[in-house]
């Protein structure tokens, strides 16, 4: 914001040109002109403060000499900072060259009131804020587009405000004419009133509130802060405005045009100074009163109201409405800074969004890379856990086997102890028999010795067999110890491996958990950032939509400006035609005047004719003033066309277009009013010309001043031709701008076509989505069929598992029954062997007693011992075979139990897998139902959005058709307005207005009101159109989001379908594996049946052997009961050959121990 600025008074310098050259050279530092005439006189008035431009009036009193009117330069000359400013632009014969002063100082002339003071050549003023001509330090100017900064700042304490009007220039001219003794020249009448000297104070004007352009850059205003003087109450920055051209219309209209010019963009000041030269009077230095505090809306409203109200005959309501309209048109300029900040921050936000998106993609990739490793580690952990369970089961099984082997070893030791006791008893019996033999007769001693030797050999063989059995037992014990050590080492190594794997799995799981937590945290942070960025993006989208709406509004305003430019072109063409007609009329009148002047020279003779000639000269001056006003009007139209060209060139600055459009509209209204006033003045001019013709017809003696008037008219004609060329150039520029606007229109049509193509693409994408939905329905049907097949396979698996369970139960029952039978048979064999041993012991005792009684019982004893040996050997062999069979059966039973447990576990696994598959299938069905519902909802939304888009399209078409109709109506109304204006122009030729003029004016007002109503309706339609476009954009964004959601769901469904297919393949592989296991179990059952059959055959053979042994024992007992009497019979019956034959018949070898 700019600092508050105090008012700055303006100085006026007045210099009489006819004063001596030396004095003028002393005061102003100018060199005397070489071709200066002695009779040149006039008044040079410089108004300091209006953009530093001088105001010059030069009059000449001699005949045939040139007199110059009012001229103010429109802009400074471009030059370096130290270049001096030119004061006047005069012809060669009247101009005086300017003297260059120091760099950075302002030029000035000396008034007649300030002679005698050496510093008065600088035009210093007391009671003002700063020196008008002192050096002004330049600072960086900040261009503010806010309307609130344009108001006059508050006054400082003690600052003197001169509110009295300036003395007019006419009074100064009149004073000079009286000093020369001549007659009053120039404009006389309403400005002949001279004020007292004490009331001739300089006033402050709002013109000084405009920023002064620096010499370096005329586009940006740079405030200058002159050094404060002792007489000033405060110092503040005071800019200077551009001069405003004036004409003969009302002063209120002038001030209104001045306000409109001050509200323009500062870049209009960069025009060529030669183009922006206007002629004006210092009437713009008006009285101003104190205003409200600066920076407030009320202050601006009060200033605008005071400017528009003064000198105007309009009502207060209309003036207030105009003030509010100006404020509304200028208000959007405040919003440009916020939009610029938003656009500046948009790039940074986009970069942040890209960085966050890249980080999110990296985290997702890392997670995707870690996911298979995590799954593999989980699978390895499960496998290691299963292996640990399997090793634990193997350890328990080995422990059970060791326990069984220990019990078997204890049983073997007991049996060995029993055999040792039997052997010791037999040895005692043999010793007793030896003693008996020693005591017995000699012939029987040799036989007994042979028997003893045989029994000794048998005992040695028994001892060797015992040793072999003990060695086998020791070897078994060593093997058991080695197996125990190996099992312990293996179990320890497996425990270490399991512990290592468990620790590794724990570390991996912890790392995975940490990485998952970090990823979840990062994802949460990214999600939060994404939400923030999405909120920012939504805000930016809203702002972009608002800016797009504003751009649409600017485009509409631009179109309106274009139409207004066309209307201005048509008005310019009409003015050109009127100018041509006026030129033709002036040429005809000049020819008539020349003819009449020639006639008047021939017959001029009296004082009455001289007076009439002077009156005619006065009328000619009035004609010149009217021509000057016409030229000013043409310059106004040229400035309007240049402003229109600049507005079209500044198409990129959309924010400033509204203010320019408002200014153009207001200028158009001002131009229309000026055109009406100029038309009235033209009518008055025509009437004056008619009166002049009548006077010329009456006088016919006017000769003097005709040639001068003719020269002036020629100059005016040349100037008119120059203005005509300028207007043609402006028209060419306007045509070029029309071409650029047509290109912009084509670009907008291309954008509309692109939007239509986008809608067609959306329709195609919707069709693709419908096809994808149909494919998903087909995939669901396929999944349903796969689910039915899986259920059938599950039923088959359940049946096979039940059948296998039944078969396993039968096999287990059969093996248990066979084991019980074998155990019972073994127990029977043990009891029989025990009874036989007891019987043998009892019989041995009996035989010993009988041997004691008779020596003939020795042979029986020997036979009995042999039989006992044979039975002992047979029982040992049976025990060994039974033990082996028992071990084999126990191993087979354990194997069958293990296989049954494995099959049971596999069945449990299968049931669990089947249950999990059922759960997955049910969950997938639920998800499919949910997806179907969501897809249906999405299709409904898409259909609704399509209907809404169609409805909005139809509404847009209706709005466009309505807008076209309104434009057509507007064009027709404009044509009617032009026709009415033409009629008014044709009717203005009459002196007395007709009765239809008021009616035409009322019709014109009605047409203008209709145009305003149509403009309002057009704005309403544009606002509705913008709302509809915003709704279409929202719907398109919503459709894109829903499409993205549908694509995501489709991808998820495809992934789930692939997972289901993979699970189906795994289930098929599991089914094949179960079929292989079933076949393997069947083969093992068949092998078990064969082994059972072999065992049963062996058991039957053992039963036959036991039956034979029982029969043999019964035969031997019968032989013992017969009581053989002689030793020969004993020897014949129980000789070694008979014993060997018995042994061979029974199938038991004596050396098989």
UniProtKB/Swiss-Prot annotation:
Keywords: Acetylation, Cell junction, Coiled coil, Phosphoprotein, Tight junction
UniProt GO cellular component terms: bicellular tight junction; myosin complex
Regions of compositional bias (Basic and acidic residues) in chain numbering: 207-220, 772-796, 827-853
Modified residues (Phosphoserine): 86, 126, 128, 131, 146, 205, 208, 324, 1125-1126
Annotated positions of the N6-acetyllysine modification: 562
Skewed-composition ranges (Polar residues): 1115-1124
Region (Head): 1-342
GO MF annotations, alphabetized: microtubule binding
InterPro entries for this protein: Myosin_tail (IPR002928)
Coiled-coil ranges (or none): 343-1110
Motif ZIM per record, residues: 38-52
Region span, Interaction with TJP1/ZO1: 44-57
Record note on quaternary structure: Homodimer. Interacts with TJP1/ZO1 and SPEF1.
Function summary: Probably plays a role in the formation and regulation of the tight junction (TJ) paracellular permeability barrier.
Protein family: Belongs to the cingulin family.
Swiss-Prot/TrEMBL domain comment: Deletion of the TJP1/ZO1 interaction motif (ZIM) decreases but does not abolish colocalization with TJP1/ZO1.
Name the UniProt record assigns to this protein: Cingulin
């Amino acid at each position: 914001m700019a600092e508050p600025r105090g008012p700055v008074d303006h100085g006026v310098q007045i210099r009489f040109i006819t004063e001596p050259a030396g004095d003028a050279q002393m005061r102003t530092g100018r060199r005397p002109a070489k071709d200066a005439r002695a009779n040149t006189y006039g008044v040079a008035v410089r108004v300091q403060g209006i953009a530093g431009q001088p105001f010059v009036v030069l009059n000449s009193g001699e005949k045939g000499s040139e007199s110059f009117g009012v001229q103010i330069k429109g802009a400074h000359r471009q030059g370096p900072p130290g270049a001096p400013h030119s004061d006047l632009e005069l012809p060669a014969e009247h101009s005086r060259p300017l003297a260059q002063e120091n760099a950075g100082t302002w030029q000035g002339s000396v008034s007649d009131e300030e002679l005698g003071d050496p510093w008065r050549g600088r035009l210093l003023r007391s009671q003002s804020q700063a020196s008008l001509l002192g050096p002004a330090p330049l600072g960086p100017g900040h261009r503010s587009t806010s309307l609130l900064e344009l108001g006059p700042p508050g006054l400082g304490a003690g600052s003197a405000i001169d509110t009295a009007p300036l003395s007019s220039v006419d009074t100064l001219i009149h004073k000079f004419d009286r000093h020369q003794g001549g007659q009053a020249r120039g404009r006389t009448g309403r400005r002949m009133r001279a004020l007292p000297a004490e009331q001739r104070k300089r006033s402050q004007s709002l013109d000084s509130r405009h920023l002064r352009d620096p010499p370096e850059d005329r586009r940006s205003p740079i405030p200058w802060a002159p050094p404060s003087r002792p007489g000033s109450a405060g110092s503040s920055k005071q800019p200077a405005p551009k001069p405003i051209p004036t004409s003969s219309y009302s002063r209120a209209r002038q001030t209104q045009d001045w306000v409109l010019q001050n509200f323009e963009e500062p870049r209009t000041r960069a025009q060529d100074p030669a183009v922006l030269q206007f002629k004006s009077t210092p009437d713009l230095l008006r009285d101003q009163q104190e205003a409200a505090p600066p920076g407030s809306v009320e202050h601006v409203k009060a200033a605008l109201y005071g400017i528009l109200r003064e000198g105007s005959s309009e009502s207060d309501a209309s003036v207030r409405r105009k003030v509010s309209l100006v404020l509304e048109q200028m208000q959007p300029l405040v919003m440009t800074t916020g939009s610029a900040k938003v656009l500046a921050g948009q790039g940074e936000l986009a970069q942040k969004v890209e960085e966050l998106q890249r980080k999110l993609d990296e985290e997702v990739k890392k997670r995707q890379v870690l996911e298979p490793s995590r799954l593999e580690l989980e699978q390895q952990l499960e496998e290691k856990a299963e292996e640990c369970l399997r090793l634990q089961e193997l350890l328990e099984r080995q422990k059970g086997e060791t326990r069984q082997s220990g019990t078997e070893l204890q049983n073997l030791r007991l049996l060995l102890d029993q055999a040792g006791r039997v052997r010791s008893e037999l040895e005692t019996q043999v010793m007793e028999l030896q003693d008996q033999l020693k005591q017995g007769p000699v012939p029987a001693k040799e036989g007994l010795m042979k028997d003893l030797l045989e029994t000794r050999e048998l005992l040695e063989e028994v001892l060797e067999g015992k040793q072999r059995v003990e060695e086998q037992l020791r070897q078994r014990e060593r093997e058991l110890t080695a197996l125990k050590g190996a099992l312990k080492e293996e179990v320890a190594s497996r425990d270490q491996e399991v512990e290592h794997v468990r620790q590794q799995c724990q570390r991996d799981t912890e790392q995975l958990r940490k990485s998952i937590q970090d990823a979840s945290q990062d994802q949460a942070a990214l999600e939060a950032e994404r939400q923030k960025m999405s909120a920012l993006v939504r805000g930016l989208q809203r702002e972009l939509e608002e800016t797009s709406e504003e751009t649409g509004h600017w485009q509409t305003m631009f179109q309106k400006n274009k139409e207004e430019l066309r209307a201005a072109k048509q008005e310019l063409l009409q003015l050109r035609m009127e100018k041509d007609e006026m030129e033709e009329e002036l040429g005809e009148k000049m020819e008539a005047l020349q003819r009449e002047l020639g006639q008047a020279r021939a017959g001029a003779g009296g004082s009455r004719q001289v007076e009439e000639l002077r009156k005619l000269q006065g009328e000619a001056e009035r004609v010149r003033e009217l021509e000057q006003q016409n030229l000013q009007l043409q310059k106004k139209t040229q400035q309007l066309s240049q402003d229109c060209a600049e507005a079209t060139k500044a198409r990129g600055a959309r924010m400033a277009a509204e203010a320019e459009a408002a200014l153009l509209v207001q200028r158009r209204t001002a131009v229309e009013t000026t055109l009406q006033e100029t038309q009235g003045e033209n009518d008055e001019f025509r009437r004056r010309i008619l009166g002049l013709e009548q006077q010329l017809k009456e006088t016919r003696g006017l000769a003097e001043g005709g040639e001068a008037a003719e020269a002036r008219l020629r100059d005016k004609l040349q100037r008119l031709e120059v203005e005509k060329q300028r207007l043609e150039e402006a028209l060419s520029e306007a045509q070029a701008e029309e071409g650029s606007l047509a290109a912009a229109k084509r670009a907008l049509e291309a954008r509309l076509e692109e939007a239509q193509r986008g809608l067609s693409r959306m329709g195609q994408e919707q069709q693709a989505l419908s096809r994808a939905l149909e494919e998903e329905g087909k995939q669901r049907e396929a999944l349903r069929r796969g689910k039915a097949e899986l259920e059938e396979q599950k039923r088959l698996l359940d049946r096979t598992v039940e059948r296998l369970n039944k078969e396993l139960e039968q096999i287990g029952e059969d093996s248990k029954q066979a084991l019980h039978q074998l155990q019972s048979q073994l127990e029977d064999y043990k009891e029989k062997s025990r009874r036989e041993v007891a019987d043998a012991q009892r019989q041995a005792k009996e035989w010993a007693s009988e041997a004691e009684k008779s020596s003939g019982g020795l042979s029986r004893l020997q036979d009995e011992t042999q039989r006992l040996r044979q039975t002992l050997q047979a029982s040992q062999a049976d025990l060994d075979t039974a033990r082996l069979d028992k071990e084999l059966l126990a191993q087979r039973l354990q194997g069958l139990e293990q296989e049954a447990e494995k099959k049971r576990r596999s069945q449990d696994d299968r049931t669990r897998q089947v249950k999990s598959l059922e759960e997955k299938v049910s969950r997938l069905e639920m998800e499919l139902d949910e997806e179907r519902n969501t897809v249906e909802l999405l299709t409904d939304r898409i259909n609704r959005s399509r209907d809404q888009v169609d409805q909005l399209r139809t509404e847009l078409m209706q709005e466009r058709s309505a807008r076209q109709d309104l434009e057509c109506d507007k064009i027709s109304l404009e044509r009617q307005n032009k026709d009415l204006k033409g009629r008014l122009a044709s009717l203005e030729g009459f002196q007395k207005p007709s009765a239809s003029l008021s009616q035409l004016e009322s019709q014109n007002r009605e047409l203008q009101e209709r145009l305003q109503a149509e403009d309002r309706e057009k704005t309403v339609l544009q606002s509705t159109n913008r709302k509809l476009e915003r709704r279409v954009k929202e719907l398109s964004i919503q459709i894109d989001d829903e499409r993205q959601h549908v694509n995501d769901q489709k991808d998820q469904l495809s992934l789930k379908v692939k997972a289901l297919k993979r699970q189906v393949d795994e289930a098929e592989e599991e089914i094949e594996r179960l079929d292989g296991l079933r076949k393997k179990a069947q083969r093992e059952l068949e092998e078990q049946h064969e082994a059972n059959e072999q065992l049963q055959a062996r058991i039957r053979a053992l039963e036959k052997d036991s039956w034979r042994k029982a029969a043999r024992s019964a035969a031997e007992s019968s032989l013992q009961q017969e009581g053989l009497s002689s030793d020969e019979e004993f020897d014949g019956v129980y000789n070694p050959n008979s014993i060997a034959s018995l042994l061979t018949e029974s199938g038991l070898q004596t050396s098989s121990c």
